[in-house]
Amino acid sequence: MAIPVVVVGCAGKMGREVVKAVHAAPDMAVVGAVDRSHIDEDAGELAGIGPIDVLVTDNLEITCAMVAQERAPGVMVDFTHPRGIYDRVRSAIAYGVRPVVGTTGLPPEHIEELAEFADKASTGCIVAPNFAIGMILLQQACLRAAEYFDHVEIIELHHNRKADAPSGTALATAQMIATTGKTFNVPEVSESELVAGARGGMTPGDIRIHSLRLPGLLAHQAVIFGGLGQSYTLRHDTTDRAAYMPGVLLAIRKVLGLKSLVYGLEKII
């Protein structure tokens, strides 16, 4: 039986990719499409795949209630703005619909509260700052490199319509490196910034992140390690949003077997 999937933000760039990917998956079906715009338009037409007989609505509650009547457990995929995501996830869980969230910029306290809510409801939920498999492999390689290098900085580059900085992926990468427990980037000179912020933002793990926002970019990240007489650069480039879809489809399948919130795609690979 096909997994019923609701796509929130279906009119956005990521939402349209999700509609296409889910519709093409043999074990899934788009049964709901939610957005603030393009009401009553066919979600398939918006995604460029032709009509799929699913009309866009702005009412998530009614959509989740409808999905709850399906014989198979439903999943909500949300790649929208962080504003309101907390309430949307709670609404989905209340109806037994499993959320898969790719929205970045969620405050840690909201993630903790959602984890408690999912635990009490014994309902699976996946929140991930990045769904690109290549990025997950990069982060895992960073842990290995961090064993041998004492200096590291992160440069993340995104399109100029990305609202949050640094990216959730860059923050997650810094946090992952910091779990090694090492002290990184001990200064060897007394630094002074001639322009405020020139050295980037410092994370709690003493790892600097530099954020670039430019037209012509999509999503890119470089993690640069430095040591005596050498540097080591790990880089991942996303040139098309289709890169996220294998991870999204994996999360949709995996969330059905969970009873709590999982943060990070690396936890289910």
Curated annotation (Swiss-Prot):
The protein, known as: 4-hydroxy-tetrahydrodipicolinate reductase
Q: What is its EC number?
A: 1.17.1.8
Origin, by domain of life?
Bacteria
Q: Which organism is it from?
A: Gloeobacter violaceus (strain ATCC 29082 / PCC 7421)
Cite the PANTHER family for this sequence: 4-HYDROXY-TETRAHYDRODIPICOLINATE REDUCTASE 1, CHLOROPLASTIC-RELATED, DIHYDRODIPICOLINATE REDUCTASE
Q: Where is the catalytic site?
A: 158 (proton donor/acceptor), 162 (proton donor)
Query: What residues does NAD(+) bind to?
Result: 9-14, 35, 102-104, 128-131
Q: Provide a Gene Ontology MF annotation, just one.
A: NADP binding
